[in-house]
């Protein structure tokens, strides 16, 4: 063994023991002939002292610089009084170094690794990710991620789940995003697709009698990136037979409760279950952040007869919405602050942001401050009564197509809540249930809200006659406004699966071409089954307080799906393309 202990594991229990450490020089200080080295490894830091009484070790330490890899043997001793460091696990002790060996020298790193804050671009960090990972902050997050996956495996193993791998090279199926395609050399002109999820394979495992399955699976989606999206991501994928939706939610809730209790010391009460319709009505989001107590109120019925077209139009539009957002005590917002919120909702397509400041409600119209009061004077007091407005409040209004209002006012609710420190708790988990089975696309066709294998609450006949009214047996776990997991019961009869395909405009021929293996499996006695998939990256991001999932992934891609470290994606040799039967078409030069 090259070492006896990790640097960060040494405590007072090792005092007077001789130890051997291996690690990096985190920081070097020379104090009046005595050299101090803060040695760092995966588990943390320890202070090593080298004095001139060991001249060979002292000479080696004198040449060592930041990020040198050293092997040090020495005796653990208590630090002198007044020099302890309560912020370190090893802060009560130090190692008196006797022997030092340089295992590897280091050039000066392109950015400091020993600062608590790092002032360098993310792309530069990703280019030197092997160095960035050395930073204690990054090491802590990756260590935490490992603890999460280990706890999840143990929990699922204890509940009878089997870890089963599913294929990475499969065929393209419509799941909402673009597939990453892999050309086949053997089957020239044909392509594999990297899986967007193991959805169909885990259903086939249920048909095969596996009963309870899980997998920590790599998934791939060729879509535009955001702070919480990557082209390749990790899913905690779960499927089980002969359990209903309540059983599955209870099981997954128990796992989440254990995660937060064991790793963060956070105790959750029973998760609230909120219908999708309530979430959209009160919070304008299917993943509401319940830390923010603000709610939206529908007021379109009061606006139908007003002469103000901004309100009257959406009030009479079946696809429109007018929502009011009362912010208690925020009547002191300045015009410039309101202008900033107006710009903010514009990001979501809103054309403006109407408001009423309630100064002295007992004075009626005279006690209000607003550019819109004169247009809605006949109903303004009724409006304020409905939203529960009081003196000192401000009420914002969104009026447009329902989607624009929901996107804009839902985001505004959360932003104002954070800006004004209105959050009532640190964590707010819930289940959102009773999702619509379908939603209408711009072309008037039905599309799946989740995926076409979700079990509806409706009968086959009702799905065929009135798909727009069908609800699904689907459930999303939401935490602090982020969807961390989503699942459903699955269709397990051939008749229902064909009815769903029909509602989606998928012909029998297309269904057989793309899903013949699934349809065939449903002919041979599929059990009732369902499951859920957690986004591991997003879950760890929330639990560690990271601002991006790129900070909890060892080697992530940038927002443009590139890897600065390896320069992927990259061109390939012409002979490789030729073997695959692929020829690149030169882009036409732009005319001058």
From Swiss-Prot:
GO terms for molecular function: aspartate-tRNA ligase activity; aspartate-tRNA(Asn) ligase activity; ATP binding; nucleic acid binding. The gene is aspS. The keyword Nucleotide-binding applies. It holds the Pfam family tRNA_anti-codon. Homodimer. One of its GO terms (cellular component) is cytoplasm. Residues 199-202 are annotated as: Aspartate. It comes from the Bacteria. SUPFAM superfamilies: Class II aaRS and biotin synthetases, GAD domain-like, Nucleic acid-binding proteins. This is Aspartate--tRNA(Asp/Asn) ligase. ATP binds at residues 221-223, 230, 483, 535-538. Gene3D superfamilies: Bira Bifunctional Protein, Domain 2, GAD-like domain, Nucleic acid-binding proteins. PROSITE patterns: AA_TRNA_LIGASE_II (PS50862). It catalyses: tRNA(Asx) + L-aspartate + ATP = L-aspartyl-tRNA(Asx) + AMP + diphosphate. L-aspartate binds at residues 175, 221, 450, 490. It is found in: Cytoplasm. It comes from Acinetobacter baumannii (strain SDF).
